[in-house]
């Protein structure tokens, strides 16, 4: 079970998240939506302990961390002077993973990352991330920068992975979430509201309602 409780998260005395509770007990794909600046990325970082906040986040009895939870930032940090193969080994060593021999995306092994396009860099990071099977994945705008074929490959991979893992996807591509997620969390006014797949019509009304 994944449980995130954020009593308060502030930046320079501005409240970003407050009295937020998120609890997921079953594997599946879950969406996270919200307007720009609502705190979607901050939520992920708080849960992982990458940002200071008042609250707690647990996966079962363990604290959520980068050791037991996978995280793909919207703009992954890569080392341009490494090849993809070198980066995969570096990532595996950093997070105590077994280097993989099979990868989701085919990429040149001997090219430096600095020679890659934005989409190829995203593929490089995802390949490194998926070297291990995690129980929880936080994916922040994972489809951004990828071409149609890569998005198709990634989505099908995540759908299969979601049979045994909790996968939370932050995305502005709402149709992908509607068509594939078990439920969607709407982040608005510092808090989250959950909508299951039978309530997605209500989600749109709530999202565009200017009242709290």
PLM-predicted stretches and their roles:
Residues 137-141:
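Catalytic Walker B motif of ABC-type/P-loop ATPase nucleotide-binding domains
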Residues 75-125, 132:
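ABC-family P-loop ATPase nucleotide-binding domains
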Residues 191-211:
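Conserved beta-strand-loop-alpha-helix hinge in the C-terminal portion
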Residues 173-179:
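Conserved H-loop
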Residues 48:
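Helix-to-loop junction immediately C-terminal to a conserved catalytic motif
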Residues 148-149:
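Helix N-cap at the start of a conserved alpha-helix in ABC-type nucleotide-binding domains
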Residues 2, 17-19:
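Conserved structural motif at the start of ABC-family nucleotide-binding domains
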Residues 33-35:
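The feature captures the beta-strand-to-loop junction immediately N-terminal to the Walker
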């Amino acid at each position: 079970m994944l449980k995130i409780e954020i009593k308060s998260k502030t930046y320079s005395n501005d409240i970003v998240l407050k009295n937020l509770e998120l609890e997921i007990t079953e594997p599946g794909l879950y969406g996270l939506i919200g307007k720009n600046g609502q705190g979607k990325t901050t939520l992920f970082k708080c849960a992982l302990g990458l940002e200071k906040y008042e609250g707690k986040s647990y996966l079962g009895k363990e604290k959520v961390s980068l050791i037991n939870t996978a995280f793909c930032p919207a703009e992954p940090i890569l080392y341009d002077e490494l090849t993809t193969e070198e980066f995969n080994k570096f990532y595996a060593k950093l997070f105590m993973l077994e280097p993989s021999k099979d990868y989701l995306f085919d990429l040149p092994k001997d090219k430096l990352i600095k020679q890659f396009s934005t989409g190829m860099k995203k593929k490089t990071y995802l390949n490194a991330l998926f070297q291990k099977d995690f129980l929880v994945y936080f994916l922040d705008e994972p489809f951004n920068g990828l071409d149609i074929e890569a998005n198709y490959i990634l989505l099908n991979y995540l759908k299969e992975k979601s049979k045994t893992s909790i996968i939370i996807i932050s995305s502005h591509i709402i149709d992908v979430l509607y068509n594939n997620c078990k439920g969607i969390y709407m982040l608005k006014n510092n808090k989250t509201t959950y909508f299951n797949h039978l309530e997605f019509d209500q989600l749109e009304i709530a999202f565009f309602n200017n009242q709290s």
